[in-house]
Design a protein with these regions (language model features):
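Accessory RNA-recognition modules of RNA-modification enzymes
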Residues: 1-325, 330-338
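S-adenosylmethionine
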Residues: 304-389, 394
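Short loop segments at secondary-structure junctions
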Residues: 136, 394-396
């Protein structure tokens, strides 16, 4: 690539995507692939009236935590899947803690120094991966700011059992989601515009359309259909369920309303822990079917196929409830925080994979009377800038 300005600068602090420094004219610049306190030669890719974005072309003075990326597809203008391959584990954890603390302060008004809890080994920890297919039928991920994809021969984070998928040829133009959930055989979900979704084994053979994953957790086998959400880190379901149950046990109310409840992961854990009544709300037809299968025979659990929005919450919520919510990356739907406040629920246990939307929603909940009691973060997305959070807020 040519025609871009280049400049040498010192980075000052962590920021999303890398680190931030200042150009010679004083403009703040966000530098991908850089770490705090490094001297770098930067290629400027974008300028706005307030800031610039760039990539670290050369590291002139390195952070002590800088390492060689373990994945052969990492690097400048390469795979956009992982942002922190160039940092050792301790540096990644410190980086994530600083960035998350800053997001909470700026967007949520929460003064909280985030501590990141490491969870197991990174390599092979990922159970799901969504890829595109190039014109030669090869699995690929998008490159940063590039139209041409990065063809993959491996994924360092993906379950070892699924690596064979990168040697298989797939339908051109398809989206392929590799699923290696639980102990069963991994498979791929193949989606092409205008065609029915196919389930294939990782050598490309078409499987029965009713193929599902079976995940053994807490002496219970969960059914997870191809269109249903399941956490991407192998240890995430257990880690998050344990924390949700702990937060429920600390609360004054026994009744639980589980929002964005998916296939029933938290409802199962809460009922098993002794919750006398759990009501779940989920809009995905696939996840609702799975939840009804996974929670069959639980007399205290009621599964509702509903979108999470103020009009559906009003007849469900009661004063004193404990609400558990695990919304998508976009956070709570409009008006949901206000609906929780109007109902007078006693405690909100908020599970989030996005620090920015969590901070926004904590601010909204604070405005209707909720006070943050605890916030924990788990490194369930190693080598990337993402974290999983569990925030607990009580009625003030």
């Amino acid at each position: 690539m040519s025609g871009f300005d280049e400049e040498v600068l010192d980075t000052l602090r962590p920021a999303l995507g890398g680190a931030v420094g200042h150009l010679g004219d004083g403009t703040a610049v966000f530098v991908r692939h850089a770490l705090e306190g490094e001297r770098v030669r930067v290629r400027i890719n974008e300028r706005t009236a307030k800031f610039a974005r760039g990539d670290a072309l050369e590291i002139l003075s390195a952070h002590p935590g800088r390492v060689k990326a373990p994945c052969p597809h990492a690097g400048l203008d390469r795979c956009g899947g992982c942002d922190l391959q160039h940092a050792d584990e301790a540096t990644q954890v410190a980086w994530k803690a600083r960035v998350a603390s800053d997001q909470l302060r700026r967007l949520g008004g929460v003064e909280h120094e985030v501590e990141v809890i490491s969870v197991g080994e990174a390599r092979g920890s990922r159970s799901r991966l969504r890829c595109l297919v190039d014109n030669e039928g090869r699995l690929a991920l998008r490159r940063v700011r590039r139209h041409d994809p990065e063809v993959l021969t491996t994924c360092w984070l993906l379950d070892e059992r699924a690596q064979i998928a990168f040697s298989t040829r797939w339908p051109r133009g398809a989206e392929v989601e590799i699923r290696a959930l639980g102990e069963g055989e991994p498979f791929a979900v193949v989606r092409l515009p205008g065609r029915p979704t196919e389930i294939r084994d990782l050598e490309g053979r078409v499987l029965h359309p009713d193929t599902v994953s079976r995940v053994d957790l807490d002496s219970h086998v969960f059914t997870v259909s191809p269109d249903s959400f399941w956490q991407s880190h192998h240890l995430a379901p257990e880690v998050l369920s344990d924390r949700v149950v702990e937060a429920w046990r600390e609360a004054p109310g026994a009744r639980v309303v589980d929002l964005y409840s998916g296939v029933g992961l938290f409802a199962h854990a809460l009922e098993r822990a002794g919750a006398s009544e759990v009501v779940t709300l989920e809009s995905s037809p696939s996840a609702v079917r799975d939840a009804r299968e996974n929670l069959r025979g639980r007399r205290g659990v009621k599964v509702l196929a509903r979108r999470v929005e103020p009009r559906t919450l009003a007849p469900v919520l009661r004063e004193g409830d404990v609400v558990v919510c695990d919304p998508p990356r976009t956070g709570l739907a409009r008006g949901v925080a206000q609906a929780l406040g109007q109902a007078g629920v006693a405690r909100v246990v908020y599970v989030s994979c996005d620090g920015a939307t969590l901070a926004r929603d904590i601010r909204a909940l604070s405005q209707v009377g909720y006070v943050p009691r605890s916030l924990e973060s788990f490194d369930l997305f190693p080598l990337t800038e993402h974290l999983e959070f569990v925030a607990v807020l009580d009625r003030g």
